[in-house]
A protein has these predicted regions:
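A short small-residue
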Residues: 2-3, 116, 189-196
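Short, glycine-/small-residue-rich phosphate/pyrophosphate-handling segment
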Residues: 1-20, 148-189
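Short, intrinsically disordered/low-complexity patches at protein termini
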Residues: 131, 137, 143, 150-152, ...
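N-terminal beta1-alpha1-beta2 submodule of the flavodoxin-like/Rossmannoid cofactor-binding fold
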Residues: 11, 15-145, 197-224
């Protein structure tokens, strides 16, 4: 931060506090007449409860929301290995990352295009999946030169037994607090379903899907 702001650590602290207070007092988020939504997942369509819920949410979203879906399982998404700061900044200034691949060719352009991102996160071990973690880590190179204040964060999390709140917290700390994505209230839909196909049989699931879809539309699309 200090290097980015051309100051020392204390100067960066004061400047960051000033930016934070300004953002709190003057919320800048504005819905649009047409919005772009990037959906990221690393799941199997045939067995995924998380994807099953997303398909129903998708059906209820306003037609003015343009959707792009990327499956992080398609090809190998190499995780960040912690390049030196100046090297990461150098590649970030070119909209690239040292490790290249799908992250640079497909995902960076999609993130730039998006007004919001929706992460589909099945919970197996109270942690985001390896591919999802790699996406967040590799986003750092782009973040060196691009802030994401004007992009909203949403999530759908399905746990076999418990722990959805832990993954929601990871999304908040990694993408809102660290990467500056805009965080709407109740940004995440959390469900508990163990066996394949169980999510869509949960009591009240259709009502919760409707509520979440309407919330996303309200955040992204300007009322006419």
């Amino acid at each position: 931060q200090a290097a980015n702001m051309n100051t020392d650590r204390f100067g960066a602290y004061k400047k960051s506090a000033e930016i934070l207070v300004h953002q709190i007092l003057e919320e800048t988020w504005q819905p649009k007449e047409e919005s772009h939504l990037l959906v990221l997942h690393a799941s199997n369509h045939r067995t995924s409860n998380t994807l099953a819920i997303w398909q129903k949410v998708k059906e209820r979203l306003d037609d003015r929301i343009r959707i792009q879906e990327i499956n992080l399982r398609n090809g190998t998404l190499v995780d960040c290995s912690g390049c030196p700061y100046k090297m990461c900044l150098h590649f970030g200034e070119q909209g690239k990352c040292f490790y290249g691949g799908a992250m640079v060719e497909n995902i960076y352009p999609a993130v730039k295009w998006a007004d919001a991102i929706l992460l589909l996160c099945p919970n197996y071990n109270d942690a985001l999946s390896a591919n999802m973690t790699a996406f967040i880590n590799r986003l750092t190179a782009l973040f060196r030169t691009t802030r994401f204040y004007d992009k909203a964060l949403f999530g759908i999390i399905v746990s076999g037994y418990s722990g959805s709140d832990l993954l929601a917290g990871q999304l908040v700390t990694a993408l809102n607090m660290n990467k500056t994505f805009y965080l709407p209230g109740n940004f995440c839909m959390m469900e508990t379903a163990n066996n394949a196909g169980a999510a869509m049989k949960l009591p009240g699931i259709e009502d919760r899907i409707k509520e979440f879809s309407e919330k996303m539309t309200h955040i992204l699309i300007k009322e006419t």
